């Protein structure tokens, strides 16, 4: 099947300035991400950035760049700018891969594209089971609850579903009911255009989760269980050191 991958790579980062260009074993992080995405079989790969240094690094590695504005409020807004500049048709399948995931398995990039293509829905994503209490109660690990058909009922930083009987006895174990959302999305290009036309929702401001805008406006997001678990993403200097060690 045919799909396009867009990799947003914003230069500014509060916790890790110049994040796309941090060195991981001799290469900028954004180049590692580009190499993983190439393994997915995507028809076209575009790095969306607001900084010339990132553009030069990507082009030196043979990648395609789309320069975007620096004032976008969300990654989806940056995607929408690329969709318009490139003139993608409404039915083009677009996969959004984060620029700070140098260990993302190629198989899940293709998986989210295929899941979207097989369904009459505008958006798809992935999740993995949570097995540790530490992760279940960590607000940085976004949880998702699904319906019987695999569509998202809600995303939250809170621990959902709350296992009343289990947690009344102990918070040391979590059972097998919690799912962690992975930050990879598949969209049809026309859906991205619609998304950015909607006003932000109260829920997305409360949770700081932009996918809640989709549910707020009554649209569906399909969620599949990922075929592979991604390695560590890079949000902080400590994450960077872990990734460097794991990728040696």
Swiss-Prot record:
UniProt cross-references to Pfam families, sorted A to Z: CTP_transf_3
An example Gene Ontology molecular-function term: 3-deoxy-manno-octulosonate cytidylyltransferase activity
Keyword Ligase: no
Reactions catalysed according to its record: 3-deoxy-alpha-D-manno-oct-2-ulosonate + CTP = CMP-3-deoxy-beta-D-manno-octulosonate + diphosphate
Cell compartment(s), UniProt: Cytoplasm
Involved pathway(s): Nucleotide-sugar biosynthesis; CMP-3-deoxy-D-manno-octulosonate biosynthesis; CMP-3-deoxy-D-manno-octulosonate from 3-deoxy-D-manno-octulosonate and CTP: step 1/1; Bacterial outer membrane biogenesis; lipopolysaccharide biosynthesis
UniProt EC number: 2.7.7.38
Gene3D superfamilies (alphabetical): Spore Coat Polysaccharide Biosynthesis Protein SpsA, Chain A
Location, primary (coarse class): cytoplasm
Gene Ontology, cellular component aspect: cytosol
Enzyme class, UniProt record, top EC level: transferase
InterPro entries documented for this protein: Cytidylyl_trans (IPR003329), KdsB (IPR004528), Nucleotide-diphossugar_trans (IPR029044)
A Gene Ontology BP annotation from the UniProt entry: lipopolysaccharide biosynthetic process
Disulfide bonds: none
Record keywords: Cytoplasm, Lipopolysaccharide biosynthesis, Nucleotidyltransferase, Transferase
Keyword Cytoplasm in record: yes
Family: Belongs to the KdsB family.
Known function: Activates KDO (a required 8-carbon sugar) for incorporation into bacterial lipopolysaccharide in Gram-negative bacteria.
Protein name: 3-deoxy-manno-octulosonate cytidylyltransferase
Organism per entry: Salmonella dublin (strain CT_02021853)
Name of the encoding gene: kdsB
